[in-house]
Amino acid sequence: MSLSRRLTLCAAAAAATALSLPAWAQTKTKVAAIYTVPVEQQWVSRIDKALKAAVARGEIEYVFSENVANADYERVMRGYAEKGHTLIVGESFAVEAAARKVAKDYPKVSFVMGSSGKPQEPNFAVFDNYIQEPAYLSGMIAGGMTKSNKIGMVGGYPIPEVNRLMHAFMEGAKETNPKVKFSISFIGSWFDPPKAKEAAFAMIDKGADVMYAERFGVSDAAKEKGKLAIGNVINTQDKYPDTVVASALWNMEPTVDRALKAVKDGKFKAEDYGPYSMMKYKGSELSPLGTFEKKVPADLAKKVKDKEKAILDGKFTVKVNDAEPKSTL
């Protein structure tokens, strides 16, 4: 795959502000990120957004590489470490051994990697999008909005990070609609909108009237067929105002900001940042209903709001199930 590298710079206003600061305040952490997909892909776009927010605050210098093939990942990691970047962020799901090897070879560099594994001392921290809570809430909406009692779900790969979101969504849907059934498919890619769209079309043709858009392309199919969709990670309702009812949103800022502070304070350590994606840390949330504010029945909206409060109050815990979900249709 092609490799492109971009340098993200502060806006002119931010730069002007930085010039007025004392020298000690202008010391910036050098951060590099490595993405195996285009930066606009929903999952990595949330990491990029959080890092760019730190750029805008004048805290970091940030560069990234996108579309990095798995075979090139180790080389790119080493390149950034050699160039003096003190924090490297990425996704090591398919390159765990190689990524951890690089971390061992550069003990003075801090690594924060999306991973299915555990932290590795002393400098390899891990994270994940623990957004099963808003996924459950979005499932409640889907269960209450389907008229055919059939929901289609299209995912990338059946790995724990995807499976737990699908299971949470399904449990939420069953809470508001015990009769609901699910059609589930994985496309074997993190970024193949045409393939996801075709998988969604197949489910819609079999009666699904609400689609769970774990991947890009699903909402396009729902829009073309006049069906509804539930988004994942980002809110795309602005692009699909009559299609996307709600989305389970991932906010990477709590994770990124915690890691940056640890690096700046010289206290970075190998830890699991996954929990900072949960609602109580503002790492995730259910999107506003927006264009569907008056289309979602009031009693359904109240049930969702009450459940959201129960989660935040610690009175309800969304079960984490990492097993591969199966179709019930």
Where are these regions (language model features)?
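Flexible loop/hinge segments that line or gate small-molecule binding clefts
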Residues: 104-129, 233-243
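Hinge/cleft segment of the Venus flytrap/periplasmic-binding protein
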Residues: 265-329
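Periplasmic-binding protein-like
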Residues: 33, 85-92, 112-114, 206-216, ...
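An alpha-beta-alpha
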Residues: 51, 137-180, 184, 271-296
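Short beta-strand elements at the ligand-binding edges of bilobed clamshell
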Residues: 119-141, 153-158, 241-254
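N-terminal export leaders
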Residues: 5-10
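Sec/Tat signal peptide C-region and signal peptidase I cleavage site
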Residues: 21-25
